[in-house]
Each structure stands twice: as C-alpha cells, then as structure tokens.
Regions:
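Conserved NAD+-utilizing ADP-ribose enzyme module
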Residues: 2-11, 17-89, 110-113, 122-136, ...
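Short His-Asn-centered micro-motif
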Residues: 117-119
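Short linear interaction motifs
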Residues: 88-112
Length: 202
C-alpha cells in the first residue's frame, strides 16, 4: 500500500532549533536543500587530543601501542569508541533510510532535506533530546507536506544495513509501534509565530 504525505495549510506545529538567530515572521523553506542534521552527519570526522596533540581517530589508533594501560586511558579509549560507533550507526541508518525512501517511497519527504516538527503534546519528549544545548522552541505555521513516522524504528544500535533496511520499510510505511514516539517530516513553507528558549519551558 502506497504511503503518502499529507498536505497541510496554516497548521500550527513546533520545531526545536539549535540556532538562535531567528525572528518572529521569518520564513523557513524546507525540502530544497540538505538540513543541518544530515550535513553534520555526513561530514563527521572527529579529532582528539592525545598528549597535548590534536589528531584524527585513525592517527590515534596507530598510536595505541604507545598508550600506558591505565584506567584513565581505558576510559578515554572506551568513550571515543562509543562516540564514533554512535555517529557511524547514525550515518549508516540515515543513508539506508534515504536509499529505501528514494527507491520505494519517493513521494515522501527526505530525512536529509526535511524540517522536523512536532505537535504540542510531544514537546516535552523532544525537549529531553535537546536539553544539553541552548535551543529555541519555534512555533510555526506550516503550508506544505507532512509525513508522520515512529522514532521507534530509528534506534541506532547496529551497523547492519540489512536491519536498517527492514526498519526503514516499517518507518516509511507509517507503521506505529505499541508505544510510538511520533516525529513529523515537513516540506514546504514555515512561518515563525513565536520563539521561546527551551530552558524557559517547564
């Protein structure tokens, strides 16, 4: 069964933005170019400081034999492995999800170009994902196309393209889990109606 995005007009929804240079009345156009999330994801190439020297992860790996076996070094290496694994899982997931969308669901908004928005009753959940940043909650008036997916299918806990392909089909079909965490992908024009600091929300 073909899944389609829903056309919306003057619909009020919300977006949590890491940028803080917005003004009421500003217009956001989604769907024409890559969004910030994907731009950062595809360009991920971490640098680390080892003995006061900045280097790439691969340069650090080449020097592992010189590391003393101390708890601090073990903790340091574990944290870097955790960080890199997480980001690589994100990248593989997003690339596979886009491949599946473009081949089988081309009528739906791309996660690489969309604007993520949520409904009012979802703000509290998505706020917990952004509490480590100086973010703003934007109240938006939307005119365009909207797709609803379940964040449940986006769990980044594997490097397997087979697993992500299966999850992507569930996601793009709009299937909801028993306890769905809804997210909305938007293409079109969004007008900023209100701006509130995330930290000001209770």
């Amino acid at each position: 069964m073909e899944n389609k995005a829903v056309n919306v007009a003057n619909k009020i929804m919300y977006h949590i933005s890491r940028e803080n240079n917005w003004n009421i009345g500003d217009v956001l156009i989604a769907g024409e170019r890559e969004n910030q999330f994907w731009s950062i994801c595809k360009d991920y190439s971490p640098r680390v400081i080892v003995d006061g020297k900045e280097m790439s992860i691969f340069q650090m790996i080449d020097q592992v034999s010189n590391f003393e076996v101390t708890q601090n070094n073990i903790t340091f290496l574990y944290q870097k492995l955790k960080d890199v694994s997480k980001e690589m899982a994100f990248y593989i997931r997003e690339q596979i999800f886009e491949d599946v969308r473009s081949k089988h669901y081309p009528m739906l908004p791309s996660r690489q170009k969309c604007l993520w928005v949520c409904e009012e009753d979802q703000i509290a959940y998505w706020k917990t994902m952004k509490e480590d940043c100086q973010c703003s909650l934007l109240t938006l008036e939307l005119n365009g196309e909207l797709f609803c997916g379940d964040d449940h299918w986006l769990t980044a806990d594997t490097f397997s393209s087979v697993d992500y392909t299966d999850r992507a089909k569930h996601y793009w079909n709009g299937e909801m889990s028993d306890a769905p965490r809804k997210e909305f992908l938007f293409y079109g024009k969004a007008i900023i109606k209100e701006i509130i600091s995330i930290k000001a929300l209770r």
